[in-house]
Amino acid sequence: MSVYSSILSHHRQSFPLLAILIDPDKEEAYLPLLPQLHQVDLVFVGGSTGNSIEPCITKLRAHTNAPLVIFPGNIAQFSPMADALLFLTLLNARTADMLIEPHVHMAMPILNSGIEAIPMGYILIDGERKSSVEI
């Protein structure tokens, strides 16, 4: 069953899922959590920097059978080692390149990798700190 189908199935049955977001750049924060990952239903992996996420995915794989889903902060955060990728569209982006450019650039690598792409739109609300999506 695909990751998305599993999420929908749980939703239809009113079963909650527990998902956590791991920032690969904050190894000191996520390493202590590894022994508890068996309690998690989904693990999102991603952050705001362009560092490789593959070392983090390798460590997570050794501690959980939960699907690993990339929550990309940018186009550098892609790995066919994950189970799925959130194909994100920032709906309140201020520049056109945030709306379409990453999608065009990554469409073929995602398709060729065979990784499950889960379409998702999101809106940033009142971010007090500057992030990778702001100028």
Predicted regions and their residues:
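Conserved N-terminal beta1-alpha1 strand-loop-helix module at the mouth
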Residues: M1-K59
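Active-site mouth loops of central-metabolism enzymes
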Residues: F15-Y30, N74, Y122-I135
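Hydrophobic faces of well-ordered beta-strands that scaffold small-molecule active sites
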Residues: P16-I22, D41-V45, L68-I70, L85-F87, ...
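Generic secondary-structure signature for well-ordered alpha-helical cores
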Residues: E27, N65, F87-L90
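Short, structured coil segments at secondary-structure junctions
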Residues: Q39, T64, P80-M81
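Short, ordered loop/turn segments at secondary-structure junctions
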Residues: G47-G50, G73-I75, L90-L91
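Alpha-helix-loop-beta-strand connector modules within alpha/beta enzyme cores
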Residues: E54-I75, H105-I118
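Conserved anion-binding
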Residues: Q77-I135
